[in-house]
């Protein structure tokens, strides 16, 4: 189902803005148990074995985890209810992006992902036009839109990623063989070596422990598997 064909909310269901405000309240209060109870009570048909299913629910739960379309990402299909807290922690910035986009929409009752998708399609079309450009005509330009400054604020830049896809990888076989040949031809003049290198003596030094700054990131367990795990680690030293 394409983005334009996806249903927005269930028939006679709450508006997008209402859902966003509901989920926003749970986030601000860190009421994860309350959110789980809310989902079980109001969407019991989506719950099975403590797993919440997002499949065929349209845009409804984009307001929960702030789905951000990209050339490579897929929509989430399910989440373990026991992992709701980790899900909300790992999508804090995405949810702030949704907040800014809702302000930009100025009361329009639709999912922010539709704005992101429309702009992504603009970038894809522009990138395709560059690949098929006619040198006899003036190249087209991608007109700057208000959404661009918001996407830039959250480090979303498809232009660079699409350009990387557009460029073909260079063969490294020749380069490696040349490097090997060069390594074989290196000559060392022992008379010019003044002293042998050595490691500094650590005696007398004080090694300070890391002041950990932990973050939570989502990692796919296996390729092609929908199940994911949430890993907590220090941004400075990598401690888990």
Swiss-Prot record:
The keyword Transcription applies. Keywords: Transcription, Transcription regulation. The keyword Oxidoreductase does not apply. InterPro entries: Baculo_LEF5_C (IPR021758), Baculo_LEF5_N (IPR006923). One of its GO terms (biological process) is regulation of DNA-templated transcription. It comes from the Viruses. Belongs to the baculoviridae LEF-5 family. Required for late and very late gene expression. This is Late expression factor 5 homolog. It comes from Cryptophlebia leucotreta granulosis virus (ClGV).
């Amino acid at each position: 189902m394409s983005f334009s064909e996806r249903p927005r909310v269930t028939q006679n269901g709450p508006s997008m803005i209402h859902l966003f405000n509901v989920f926003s309240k749970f986030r601000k209060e860190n009421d994860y148990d309350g959110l789980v109870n809310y989902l079980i009570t109001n969407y019991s048909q989506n719950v099975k074995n403590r797993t919440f299913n997002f499949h065929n629910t349209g845009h409804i739960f984009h307001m929960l985890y702030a789905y951000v379309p990209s050339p490579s990402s897929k929509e989430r299909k399910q989440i373990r209810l026991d992992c709701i807290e980790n899900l909300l922690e790992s999508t804090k910035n995405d949810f702030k992006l949704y907040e800014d986009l809702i302000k930009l929409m100025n009361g329009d009752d639709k999912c922010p992902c539709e704005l992101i998708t429309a702009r992504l399609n603009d970038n894809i079309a522009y990138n395709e036009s560059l690949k098929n450009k006619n040198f006899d005509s003036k190249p087209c330009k991608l007109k700057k839109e208000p959404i661009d400054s918001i996407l830039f604020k959250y480090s979303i830049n498809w232009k660079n990623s699409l350009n990387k896809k557009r460029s073909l990888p260079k063969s490294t076989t020749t380069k490696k063989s040349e490097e090997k040949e060069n390594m074989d031809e290196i000559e060392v003049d022992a008379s010019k070596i003044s002293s042998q290198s050595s490691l500094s003596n650590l005696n007398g030094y004080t090694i300070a422990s890391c002041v950990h700054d932990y973050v939570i990131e989502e990692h796919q367990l296996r390729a092609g598997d929908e199940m994911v795990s949430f890993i907590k680690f220090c941004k400075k030293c990598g401690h888990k």
